[in-house]
Amino acid sequence: PLVLERGEEADKRQETVENFWKNGILDPDSNVQFGEGGAGTFSDGKLNTLVKDTFGRGKEVLSRFVEAGAPSEILYQQKPHLGTDQLVGIVQFMRHQIEEMGGEFRFRSTVTDLMIRDRKLNAVIVNAKEEIPAEICILAPGHSARDTFAMLEKHNINMEPKSFAVGVRVEHPQTMINQDLYGEPENDRLGASSYKVT
């Protein structure tokens, strides 16, 4: 496959994002939303989809993460967690695996248009200048690629809105949560208690 990514590869992207956090200089195409690994690269590394998995795909995905360097504990933890510090390396390892199997990645390559004739895809246009012949194109734009959605609308391609959740972070002392759920503020055998508020 050919993977076109509007942002940078993980190492360069990390520098670009740190420059934004430190100096306030935003790169509109490579930031916390766009770049290798997507928005999840700068998340806390929790891997929970809350989706029923009757076909076992989730287990396969977690196994791939372990092959790429994630801790093996994620295979049996109720709430698997990678940690932000490991995500960049894991994402890079996965890219190298795909490249070794013949896949190609192009960074700083935004799909700016589609060439459609007789309701069939003929090519994708990259950065408004390069035409790449294609009959199949899988778009994975995330939430922030409004220009991509506008381009799809221009071509009368049907789209359906996905439900969108916005969360807030609420912090409670761990001893309080342990007391409420375990009946004691600390328990070495059980570890830290977790909970979810909805």
Where is each model-derived feature located?
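Residues forming the flavin
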Residues: 1-46, 50-198
